[in-house]
Structures are given as C-alpha cells and as structure tokens.
Regions:
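Aromatic- and Gly/Pro-enriched helix-to-coil junctions and flexible linker segments
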Residues: 19-118
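Sec-dependent bacterial lipoprotein signal peptides
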Residues: 1-19
C-alpha cells in the first residue's frame, strides 16, 4: 500500500512540474544585433500595428505600436515581450492569431536586451 501511495504521489508531482511555465528562460543573443528598422518594425507592422489593433486614433488597450519611440517605450517596460511570449499575467498577443515564431520572439528579446537600437 505504501508503494502504491508513493508512486501516485510521484506521478502527481511529475505532472504538476511538467505543467509549469518556465518564464525566466535566458535567450542567447551572442552575435545577434537586431535593429528596429531592419528587424523589429517588420514584425510590429505585420503582427501588432495593424488596422484595429495597436495603431490609429484609438489603439487597442491604449498601446500604439506604430512608431519606433512608442515600440521602444512599450518594450523597455516589459509589456511587449510578456505578451508575445504569452507569459502569465499578460494578454497573449497577437490576438486571434498564432503565437509569433521563436525566431521573431528572440529578435524582439535580443533587441530589448541591446537597448532597443533604431
């Protein structure tokens, strides 16, 4: 009986641990030097700053991502990265679309880590 109980506890613990998100993953940005104009603007313009979303007179959630300055500000405070990584406590973005590719998320993360150069 004790073996069965121990086995059940171990299985439950493994299931719980496998369901947790690792939000503190480190991205290796060695040799990656994205800039806003070359790398980030195309991502934002295709996935975020589109009609009805984060652009225009009334951008979604009051967050305009249509210019370098606005994207930099939102990125440096963590909002953009949390949303595109689908972290808990943040709205998963882009809304009603597939999650951005790992490559695009890595570009954004490395861009932020390097100070968000234009």
């Amino acid at each position: 009986m004790n073996r069965l109980f121990s086995a059940v506890i171990i299985v439950i613990m493994m299931v719980i641990m496998s369901c947790s998100k690792d939000e503190a993953t480190n991205v290796d940005c060695t040799g990656v030097a994205p800039t806003y104009i070359k790398d980030i603007a195309p991502i934002m313009n295709l996935s975020c700053a589109v009609s009805g979303c984060h652009t225009g007179i009334f951008p979604a959630d009051g967050l305009d991502l249509s210019t370098y300055i606005k994207v930099k500000s939102a990125s440096l405070n963590g909002k953009v990265l949390q949303s595109i990584k689908h972290q808990s406590g943040a709205k998963a973005m882009p809304r009603d679309a597939a999650k951005l590719s790992v490559d695009k998320i890595t570009k954004v993360e490395c861009w932020i880590q390097s100070g968000a150069p234009e």
